[in-house]
């Protein structure tokens, strides 16, 4: 399971070190794509195959399904870790996530999220206030 939080800095070429714990789980190759809430999602190749299968089941006749599939797949790239443990985050994905320098990696069970440090701090502040309320809404899921 992917979990934990790590901070790294992106270099001038758009490369960033993937935390060793996450590299162990993800493997040497994985998929990086646009995520929700202005972050990036990182999936192992096996998990990505599961997601592709689920996306194939979405009805082509539904506008929201088409839009989500386009959003999710259009920005997706396969990444390979270099000898220094880094990946290159393409400019279109850096722009989507507002990544300029400092990034936060977060393990979220089956995926890693990559956030701009500034965006993550804003998001964290906004959810800290409502964390208890969110937990109450999740009561039906026996968490």
UniProtKB/Swiss-Prot annotation:
Gene3D superfamilies reported for this sequence: Transcriptional regulator MraZ domain
InterPro entries, sorted: MraZ, MraZ_C, MraZ_dom, MraZ_N, MraZ_sf, SpoVT-AbrB_dom, SpoVT-AbrB_sf
Start and end residues of each SpoVT-AbrB domain: 5-47, 76-119
Source species, domain of life: Bacteria
Chief localization: cytoplasm
One of the GO BP terms on file: negative regulation of DNA-templated transcription initiation
A single Gene Ontology CC term: nucleoid
Keywords, alphabetical: Cytoplasm, DNA-binding, Repeat, Transcription, Transcription regulation
GO molecular function, one term: DNA-binding transcription factor activity
Subcellular location field: Cytoplasm, Nucleoid
Database matches in CDD domains: MraZ_C, MraZ_N
Keyword NAD: no
PANTHER family: TRANSCRIPTIONAL REGULATOR MRAZ
Record text on subunit structure and interactions: Forms oligomers.
HAMAP family assigned to the protein according to its UniProt record, in alphabetical order: MraZ (MF_01008)
Family: Belongs to the MraZ family.
Descriptive protein name: Transcriptional regulator MraZ
Origin organism lineage: Bacteria, Bacillati, Bacillota, Clostridia, Thermoanaerobacterales
């Amino acid at each position: 399971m992917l979990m934990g939080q790590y901070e790294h800095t992106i270099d001038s070429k758009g490369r960033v070190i993937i935390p060793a714990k996450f590299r162990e789980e993800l493997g040497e190759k994985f998929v990086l794509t646009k995520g929700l809430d202005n972050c990036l999602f990182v999936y192992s190749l096996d998990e990505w195959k599961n997601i592709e299968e689920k996306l194939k089941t979405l009805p082509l006749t539904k506008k929201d399904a088409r839009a989500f599939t386009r959003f999710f797949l259009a920005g997706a790239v396969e990444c390979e870790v270099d000898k220094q443990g880094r990946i290159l985050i393409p400019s279109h994905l850096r722009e989507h996530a507002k990544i300029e320098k400092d990034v936060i990696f977060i393990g979220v069970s089956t995926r890693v999220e990559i956030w701009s440090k500034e965006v993550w701090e804003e998001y964290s502040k906004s959810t800290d206030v409502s964390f208890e309320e969110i937990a109450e809404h999740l009561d039906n899921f026996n968490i």
